[in-house]
Design a protein with these regions (language model features):
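Hydrophobic alpha-helical segments
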Residues: 1-141
């Protein structure tokens, strides 16, 4: 199956087992992201993705912090779709627009904690020496 054969579903066009999952996501974030809309073809895949998303939300990082990490990773890996999607989510979570823009273009945000998280995420993606970013992250609280 080629990429062009994947359908991005709506809450109405998705298989029945995916409809409620998509509706719940739409209720949470205000829209159905294309990634989830495409995953909806397989209710098991969509359910697993949403379960992982939910589990990630149970950690000690705030939604803004998680999205800053996601933007930094997406920027490093060159995933323009992911940069756009996570920027939207970050702003919806209340991230400062200046911080989102800084991370999108590979700069550090002014907030010390967000800076430490972005630097750490970039270092991990680059497989660089993570010692200095880890110390900075620990020092930021």
């Amino acid at each position: 199956m080629s990429e062009s054969e994947f359908q991005a579903h709506t809450t109405r066009s998705a298989p029945e087992a995916s409809q409620a999952l998509l509706q719940g996501l739409q209720d949470q974030v205000g829209f159905v992201p294309n990634l989830a809309a495409t995953m909806a073809e397989s209710p098991a895949l969509l359910s697993a993705f949403l379960g992982l998303r939910s589990a990630a939300g149970c950690g000690s990082l705030s939604p803004v912090e998680r999205e800053v990490i996601a933007i930094a990773v997406a920027t490093e890996t060159g995933c323009t779709y992911c940069v756009a999607a996570h920027s939207t989510f970050a702003l919806k979570c209340g991230a400062p627009a200046a911080a989102v823009e800084a991370v999108r273009v590979g700069r550090d945000p002014e907030d010390a904690r967000l800076e430490a998280l972005a630097r750490f995420a970039r270092a991990v993606v680059r497989r660089a020496d993570v010692g200095p970013p880890v110390r900075r992250l620990r020092g930021s609280g």
